[in-house]
Amino acid sequence: MPEVDVRLERVTKLFGEVAAVDDLSLDIATNEFFSLLGPSGCGKTTTLRVIGGFEDPTYGTVYLGGRDVTDLPPYQRDVNTVFQSYALFPHLDVYENVAFGLRRKKVEKSEIDRRVTEALRLVDLAGFERRKPGKMSGGQQQRVALARALVNRPRVLLLDEPLGALDLKLRKQMQLELKTIQQEVGITFIYVTHDQEEAMTMSNRLAVMRHGRIEQLGAPEDVYEHPATEFVAGFLGASNLLDGEVSSLNGRAQIRLSSGETVVAGDPSIDAGVGSSVRVGVRPEKISIVSQEEPAASGRNHVDGTVRLATYIGVNYQYRVDGPGGRQLTVFVQNQGAAGSHPSVGQRVRLEWLPEHTFVVEPSGESLDQEEEER
């Protein structure tokens, strides 16, 4: 069992009568790249601030490396934080910005030089030692902020949406660089973001948060492929959801849709009995779109529909299809360069997908139209 670097035990943080974090318990393993993911106001940043000591929990306990640090200020915790605002000293060059914390700790000059040089190598800024922050790009400044945190060799590095101010291309580049750096230095990274792709790209595990609680926790591929709740299905990537009722649990769950069709879910362990109302989901990229004139493929779920919108994105084609009960379904088809083989607007089509790509979640209590408006 991996060693735990960070443990939260039943942590609650109240602001007035509002619970920004609500009875949250969580273990984060040593050397893990862990992301707190969720929409604005879900409690992810407050959770990070509680770990760092910038907010005191109203209730609960915070452990770092097995030590109770709940009542310790930030400077007595073995953590460093990188914020979206780089907070660099404009009058100091790169070297002195990175060395600042070490000088305050009165580290020997030779050790400072060695550690600053190594930190700048890690973030690919060797040769920039004497440059001022004002002469650097946003991506370079973010690297300086990261080097300044890493040079202190903290047990845990907290990152609060550090890439949010960068443009899309640079943000994607920095995602891969952060993951590479984390693997090289072997420090536990705890990363806060609202960007689903960012969290899935970098994380060993992630927690999807909502209303101060964790909706689902796990490896990115597990959470994406097997969402536990309707919220997770809609927040972490795109999903198509249809209302139905469990009609059979003989090996595989059979669900009769409200529009009359029957689909099969590959997971036999769904938490619903025969007769239960459920919502059936499938990701857009899991669906094949074919002409209704073609025979239906055996062993696959299928529903009929009419193409209402076709969009060329470059890497794929995206379709909106009027499906069962008037529900609009989204389909992503990989662009493989076959000209003339794509359905057109107004065409009657069949949507097909494998049972193992079907997931089942409990209805939220709101209509699917309301759910889409919220997302």
Please place each PLM-identified region on the residue numbering.
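Conserved coupling/switch loops of ABC nucleotide-binding domains, chiefly the family-specific signature
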Residues: T58-T61, E111, H211, D243
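The feature captures the beta-strand-to-loop junction immediately N-terminal to the Walker
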Residues: L37-P39
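Pre-Walker A (P-loop) beta-loop-beta motif of ABC nucleotide-binding domains
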Residues: L24-S35, F89
